[in-house]
UniProtKB/Swiss-Prot annotation:
Name recorded for this polypeptide: Antiholin
Gene for this chain: 13
Residues in compartment: Cytoplasmic: 1-38, 93-108
Major site of localization recorded for this protein: host cell
Periplasmic topology ranges: 60-71
Lipid bilayer topology: Multi-pass membrane protein
Amino acid sequence: MKKMPEKHDLLTAMMAAKEQGIGAILAFAMAYLRGRYNGGAFKKTLIDATMCAIIAWFIRDLLVFAGLSSNLAYIASVFIGYIGTDSIGSLIKRFAAKKAGVDDANQQ
């Protein structure tokens, strides 16, 4: 009996997700380095970097959806890591408020 009969299927699945994984690693590294450089606490920096990696995992699909080249995924992943989840969240809130027609001066 083989030790790991599903090894080839596992390797195939890992190779299929290689591009997304590289983008996630780039975003994680950039967010972690940015957070530590700015003097952030280790735990907060690690959580922010993980959230950036999750967002960057799907950036290739978002670029294709937007009609842009998927070759921009690596630089977009680094950009995601650089701006961080706080900036991404505020951009999404601003976009949603504009679409909903909300004009509140107290929005950040």
